């Protein structure tokens, strides 16, 4: 689906820039419903097979259980969020605690485990995929018709096809991308529940079209800080499993 929206090269690089001020960059491609329906048929069965294969596998359990333990208190101390926090016994999920973008209209559970080890962090991710499939199915059935972006010309650039037809549209496009739009003076912090935890953005506006200050709170940067605690009194051979269980995005960590 992302390939149809933004092209295969951009999709692979995860730099599709699809979400824009006032909406999204483009409408969903033709046939997207059928593509999602096919995915919803394939993934649950395959995922269940993988889960059954690993859940009672003595080698898998022996390598991951009681390894890299992280307590709830340690998660709080280091700002660990997302599946890693929920694998340590705390049910914090922004989709439930601070609902946004209509997520409160979807039915899903927040899996919680108490062991706090590598096995629990793996297991939480599997359980959350099952819940995500429920959300996707509900979104497919509830998807409304209508515009995919606001029509306020101060925020939204003109359709690209008009750039070859209208000088006014070309000027409008140029001003939007060179000057931007003015934001009222003030500050705000908004966070969402990303696959790895709390992903937030703090922004300060001085009333101009350029932010006075902006900071992105990425989950991987915070989660990986707990690695020394996770690895305390553990052999170096456990490091690979411990890091993988946190599932960090290195681009978020390397600042």
Range-by-range predicted roles:
Residues 1-3, 8-255:
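Metal/cofactor-centered catalytic core regions of large enzymes
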């Amino acid at each position: 689906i992302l390939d149809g929206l933004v092209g295969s090269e951009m999709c692979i690089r995860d730099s599709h820039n699809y979400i824009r001020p006032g909406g999204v960059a483009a409408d969903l491609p033709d046939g997207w419903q059928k593509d999602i329906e096919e995915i919803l048929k394939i993934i649950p069965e395959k995922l269940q097979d993988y889960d059954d294969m690993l859940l009672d596998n003595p080698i898998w359990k022996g390598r991951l259980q009681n390894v890299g333990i992280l307590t709830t208190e340690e998660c709080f101390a280091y700002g660990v969020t997302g599946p890693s926090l929920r694998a340590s016994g705390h049910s914090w999920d922004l989709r439930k605690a601070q609902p946004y973008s209509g997520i409160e209209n979807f039915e899903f559970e927040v899996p919680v485990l108490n062991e706090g080890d590598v096995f629990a962090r793996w297991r939480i991710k599997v359980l959350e995929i099952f819940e995500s499939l429920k959300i996707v199915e509900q979104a497919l059935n509830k998807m409304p018709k209508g515009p995919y972006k606001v029509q306020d010309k101060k925020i939204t650039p003109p359709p690209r096809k008009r750039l070859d037809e209208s000088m006014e549209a070309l000027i409008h496009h140029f001003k939007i991308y060179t000057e931007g739009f003015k934001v009222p003076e003030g500050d705000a912090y908004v966070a969402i529940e990303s696959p790895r935890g709390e992903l937030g953005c703090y922004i300060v506006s001085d009333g101009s079209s350029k932010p006075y200050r902006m900071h992105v709170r990425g989950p991987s940067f915070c989660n990986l800080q707990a690695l020394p605690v996770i690895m305390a009194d553990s052999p170096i051979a456990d490091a690979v499993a411990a890091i993988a269980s946190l599932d960090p995005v290195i681009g978020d960590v390397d600042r």
